Swiss-Prot record:
Gene: Oard1
This protein's UniProt keywords: Acetylation, Chromosome, Hydrolase, Nucleus
Pfam family, one: Macro
EC numbers: 3.5.1.-, 3.2.2.-
Broad EC category: hydrolase
Annotated function: ADP-ribose glycohydrolase that hydrolyzes ADP-ribose and acts on different substrates, such as proteins ADP-ribosylated on glutamate and O-acetyl-ADP-D-ribose. Specifically acts as a glutamate mono-ADP-ribosylhydrolase by mediating the removal of mono-ADP-ribose attached to glutamate residues on proteins. Does not act on poly-ADP-ribosylated proteins: the poly-ADP-ribose chain of poly-ADP-ribosylated glutamate residues must by hydrolyzed into mono-ADP-ribosylated glutamate by PARG to become a substrate for OARD1.
Protein name: ADP-ribose glycohydrolase OARD1
């Protein structure tokens, strides 16, 4: 069961929901952070790997840090924000912003209007949510894309 925590605080384009990310509407595209090597061996990435597979498809896209790899599943896009070279590395805010810009471009070209995601980069990667959310707001400010962030 998801619980909506806010609608639009101070003009924010991010809505926060307490609940399971994978219970989001089936029309929402999803996003999370991974490394170039597509290991997805820990954290929420493991759940993405189990649910959507496609590791070879992701690797074949040969995306680098600051880019985005994409799978299409059941009529929606699954975005893999490439924020670091190896799974054992830590991401930078710069690479996160570049990968978000790449995702935004793909969303706009493909008519994506709703994105759901966890607090990207803030679990095992240890980025600070106040910085990440500010980057998200900045990157998507000139779009009509709605972002829903799920927390457990």
């Amino acid at each position: 069961m998801a619980t909506r925590l806010n609608e639009d605080p101070e003009g924010s384009r991010i809505t926060y929901v307490k609940g399971d990310l994978f219970a989001c509407p089936k029309t929402d595209s999803l996003a999370h952070c991974i490394s170039e090597d597509c290991r997805m061996g820990a954290g929420i990435a493991v759940l993405f790997k189990k649910r959507f597979g496609g590791v070879q498809e992701l690797l074949s896209q040969q995306k680098k840090s600051g880019e985005v790899a994409v799978l299409k599943r059941d009529g929606r896009y699954i975005y893999y924000l490439i924020t670091k070279k190896r799974a054992s590395h830590k991401p930078t805010y710069e690479n996160l912003q570049k990968s978000l810009e790449a995702m935004k471009s793909h969303c706009l070209k493909n008519g994506v209007t709703d994105l759901s995601m966890p607090r990207i980069g803030c679990g095992l990667d240890r980025l600070q949510w106040e910085n990440v959310s500010a980057i998200l707001e900045e990157v998507f400010e000139s779009t009509d894309i709605k972002i829903t962030v799920y927390t457990l």
